[in-house]
Amino acid sequence: MSTFGELANEVVNNSYHKDLLRLSWGVLSDDMEGTGLMLMANLFNMSPESRLKFGRLGHLSTGRDNSKLRGHSITLMYALKNFVDALDDVDRLKCVVEKFAVNHINRQISAEEFGKIVGPFRAVLRIRMGDYFDEEIVAAWAALIAVVQAAL
């Protein structure tokens, strides 16, 4: 199993995946709140047990009407922006990932549990990327998610 540092280096040194991450981020970030809410809704639908980790957000089915869920969705998207912005500097990427990981460690979210976001992320990418969707884009995001998992 690769270490946190090794996985971060793999992401930073893979130009093709970095291009895919940046390209897809350009699409995903066009509606950051909507994309974040879609990602969270997909997570709750595809992994209903994950709802238990989000009790502090209140009633999750209210979507945009739930300010705590909206806030979490927006914060999540800005974390992804930080990751994408750090793709050329492994030390910076590690710093922003570690900060993000601390929030999840404090909520007792394991690496395995966090990895459940890949399926919902694939679904968001399929919708948002439309005809430009490709499994290589999913692989690029999965590699970045693996860095977060290694930090947990």
From Swiss-Prot:
UniProt key word Heme: yes
Domain of life: Eukaryota
Domain Globin per the UniProt entry, residue ranges: 12-152
MF-aspect GO terms: heme binding; metal ion binding; oxygen binding; oxygen carrier activity
This protein's UniProt keywords: Heme, Iron, Metal-binding, Oxygen transport, Transport
Sequence positions that bind heme b: 104
Family: Belongs to the globin family.
Entry protein name: Globin, minor
